[in-house]
Amino acid sequence: MALSAFNKLLVGGATAALALTGVAIAAGGDTSYKNGWKDKHPEWTFTGAFGGYDREAMQRGYQVYVEVCRSCHNLDHLAFRHLGDKGAPFYNEYYKNPNDNPLIKNIAAEYTVEDIDGETGDVIERPGIPADYFPPVYPNDAAARAGNGGALPPDLSVIVKARGGGADYIYNLLLGYAHPKPDDFDITPGLYYNPVMEGGRIAMPPQLQPLDGAFEYQNELEGQNPPAATVEQMAYDVTEFLAWSADPKLEARKEAGFMTLLYLLLLSVLLWLSYKRVWKRLKQPVSG
């Protein structure tokens, strides 16, 4: 009787395990569209306890954003002055206030922003100033969808934090277009094959591959010797820039954390020495 109950329990457990396995497989989805694609994992400079952003890579990445990504994607949460903050791509120690940085002023002035005329109340257009936020590419979401085949281009200012996989995902997504499509994989007209995208289909066409060998980095700051603008290099640089955009206070946070740990360490040593000194006196035998 006990053996029969044990057999039932064993069979029930095996059935439950198989059921859970089926659920896990279903949740994982069909990955045949990946066609052997293996994610690449660059050595990002901002990872680790003491990691920080690569200034030159961010400057090149900003150029890639402006000349490639800016045609569709916004930077809704980024102001021009943020580019000149400490830890930012164009930080200059001589201009603690980024609003005074001439490079930031020049960058902002390249954009046209809407404003309100203080006398008439009319909507006017003027050159941007460091305090302005990056203006939207499209006036509204409907216009953005109309210009992109019904798809809404996501805001890129926090995209690295908003996507699972973070910087690695963005980097691989930009490279994934070059991977060969399986022969039996169907693509709806207006979509493109990318094994990194869930389902293998994406509305955004290849952005960097057509520029391989045709894109040229500019020297925004003196002393730079930019590398060749290969697809991999452009993907790395623009991802570095977007990683900073999504977490601009990363370096300041790590610095504050390090100083806090140092303070706690010194405090612990002082408390231990005080403890030893106090208890040394208390442990001495009482004379008399």
Regions found by a protein language model. Name each.
Residues 2-13:
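Bacterial N-terminal signal peptides that target proteins for export
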Residues 204-247:
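Extended, hydrophilic extramembrane loops/domains of integral membrane proteins
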Residues 65-76, 238:
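The canonical Cys-X-X-Cys-His
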Residues 23-38:
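Cleaved targeting-peptide boundary
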Residues 13-19, 24:
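Cleavable N-terminal signal peptides
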Residues 77-166, 188-219:
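Gly/Gly-Pro-rich "capping" loops immediately C-terminal to redox-active cysteine motifs
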Residues 253-288:
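Juxtamembrane interface at the cytosolic side of transmembrane helices
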Residues 38-63, 74-88, 246-254:
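Electrostatic cytochrome c docking/interface patches
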